[in-house]
Amino acid sequence: SAEMQAKSNPGDKKSTPKNPGKWLDIASLIPREVRHAFPEVLTWLPQDALLTKADIAAAKKMGVELSADDDNTIYIPLVDRRPAGTGLIFAANYQGKDFFLLMTTDKKLNISSVSVLHADKVPSAKGLKIYNQFAGQAVNKVSISAKTPLEKAVQLAVKRAGMLLYVRLKGA
C-alpha cells in the first residue's frame, strides 16, 4: 500500500504518504533527557542490556553483584555511524525508595556525568554534591568516598550501572 511504502501511519489521520511524520523515527524512542545529554546527535542505537549468567559471573569476579533485575536499555549515540558514548537511566534505592539517575559516558566508557533524573520519593538526592565526583572514572572502576548512607546508595547504584555497561559492551 502507499502508506507502507511512504512509512506513514495508517492509524493516524495526520500521517499521510506525503507527510508521514516522525512516528518511525528511532530518536522518538530515546528519552528526552538522554537526547539532551548529546545535543549534536541525531542517530541512536538503543541496545537491550539483558544480563546473561556469564555477565553476572564476570561482574561478581570484579566485586559487583548484578542480577536479572539490573537488565536495562543502553542508549548509544552515533556520530558518523560510530558510537560516541552511552546514556543509561538506572534506579538507586535509599531506605526502600527508588530514585532515578542518568549516567553518560564517552566512547571509551569513562563517565562524563551522573545526574538526578527523578527523585520525588527521595528529594534529598537532588542536592547531593557527590555526582560530580564520578566524572572521568572508568565505568568498571567506580570509587568515591561516600560519607552518608544516601551517598553510599548513589555510589552503589553508579557502580552497578557502570558494571552493567562494562560487561554488556566490553564483554568482560
Regions found by a protein language model. Name each.
Residues 2-100, 106-172:
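Intrinsically disordered terminal and processing segments
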